[in-house]
């Protein structure tokens, strides 16, 4: 691995690239295979593939707005992504867990940013539901990576507090 003092934990960006590529390939696949809102049941009453476009943020927040939200969410994603790269670069050698968490969040943010900038919406295709009574909003691999990375960040904060260490950052 390159000199950690010079590059920080930037070599962990391979995870970011992997998340981005898997996210974009999966979105392209489901756009080619499914029509809008078509469902393919994978596990009855629990899990399906579907195709949905989200012009808003998480849970379709502001999706009904006139289009300005596309640029707002893109700007937020760019600022957050730049901040994550700086944070990643400043990590020390022993902060591997945190490096992986940041790389996951960054990969997901960039995957959804690409959709938003190029397509004008985010492509979602994973649908978790319970029978026909409850549906979680459709999501994608980028959203999953962001969620896993965020949980890892939260666990890192709790671990740091419990051991009496200063919070990473």
From Swiss-Prot:
Catalysed conversion reaction: Release of signal peptides from bacterial membrane prolipoproteins. Hydrolyzes -Xaa-Yaa-Zaa-|-(S,diacylglyceryl)Cys-, in which Xaa is hydrophobic (preferably Leu), and Yaa (Ala or Ser) and Zaa (Gly or Ala) have small, neutral side chains
Description of how activity is regulated: Inhibited by globomycin.
GO molecular function: aspartic-type endopeptidase activity; endopeptidase activity
Identification of the protein by name: Lipoprotein signal peptidase
Broad class of the protein's primary localization: membrane
Transmembrane residue ranges: 10-30, 68-89, 97-118, 141-154
Residues forming the catalytic site: 124, 143
One Gene Ontology CC term in the entry: plasma membrane
Membrane topology: Multi-pass membrane protein
Database matches in InterPro entries: Peptidase_A8
Signal peptide: none
Purpose: This protein specifically catalyzes the removal of signal peptides from prolipoproteins.
The keyword DNA repair is annotated on this UniProt entry: no
EC number: 3.4.23.36
Impact reported for residue 124 to N: Loss of activity
Keywords of the record: Aspartyl protease, Cell inner membrane, Cell membrane, Hydrolase, Membrane, Protease, Transmembrane, Transmembrane helix
A Pfam family recorded for this sequence: Peptidase_A8
Originating gene: lspA
Cytoplasmic side: 1-9, 90-96, 155-169
């Amino acid at each position: 691995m390159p000199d950690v003092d010079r590059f920080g934990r930037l070599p962990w960006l391979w995870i970011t690239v992997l998340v981005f590529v898997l996210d974009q390939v999966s979105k392209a696949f489901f756009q080619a295979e499914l029509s809008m809102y078509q469902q393919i049941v994978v596990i009855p009453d629990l899990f399906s593939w579907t195709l949905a476009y989200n012009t808003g943020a998480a849970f379709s927040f502001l999706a009904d707005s006139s289009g300005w939200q596309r640029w707002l969410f893109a700007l937020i994603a760019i600022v957050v992504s730049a901040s994550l790269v700086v944070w990643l670069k400043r990590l020390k050698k022993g902060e591997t867990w945190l490096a992986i968490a940041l790389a996951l969040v960054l990969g997901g943010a960039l995957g959804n940013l690409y959709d938003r900038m190029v397509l004008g919406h985010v492509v979602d295709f994973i649908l978790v539901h319970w029978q026909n009574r409850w549906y979680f909003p459709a999501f994608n691999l980028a959203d999953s990576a962001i969620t896993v990375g965020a949980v890892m960040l939260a666990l890192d904060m709790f671990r740091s507090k419990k051991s009496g260490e200063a919070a990473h950052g």
